[in-house]
Amino acid sequence: MQKEGASEIMSREIERFRDIYKYVDVRTDGKAVYLMLGLEVQDKVHYAMPVRTMLYDAMEYASQVQKNAKLIKKSGREKAERKVDSGEFLSGFRKDDRLIPVITLVLYLNPDIWDGPRSLSDMYAPYDDAIKPYINDYKINLISPAELGHEDFMKFHTDLGKVLEFIKFSDDKGKME
């Protein structure tokens, strides 16, 4: 019987699919900003959401590095404009390469307040404060109708604001009228 390697186990176990995923060109102050936008739509609280979004984002960054590594290997076989050093070749990432930022939004379609963790640190077991500077954290970007005010609903340039407001007051018949 042949043993599975760690990479085969990992690739099998972390195959995940986002609800919605788009490449976005955002313009601010006349400058273009490119990013990857993931959307997780929840109607119930997912109590491990910080881990889930961190995993999705990390998988996208790893995918970008992997695509870059293929380009580096291909350029090594062809005439490259700049020689790649051994560290760049091994990592699959040149010193001046850059990743496209990934943002994951969690859209909670429920009138109740999200009572789950909002960051990885909210999920940690108790630990000594002396190690806190060494522990990484990861927060979720949550849109929860119950936590939005009237002025927040107005910020949406589509009917999504109206839908979220409807969700917020769906349990309150008096405010629905």
Predicted regions and their residues:
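Elongated, amphipathic alpha-helical interaction scaffolds
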Residues: M1-E177
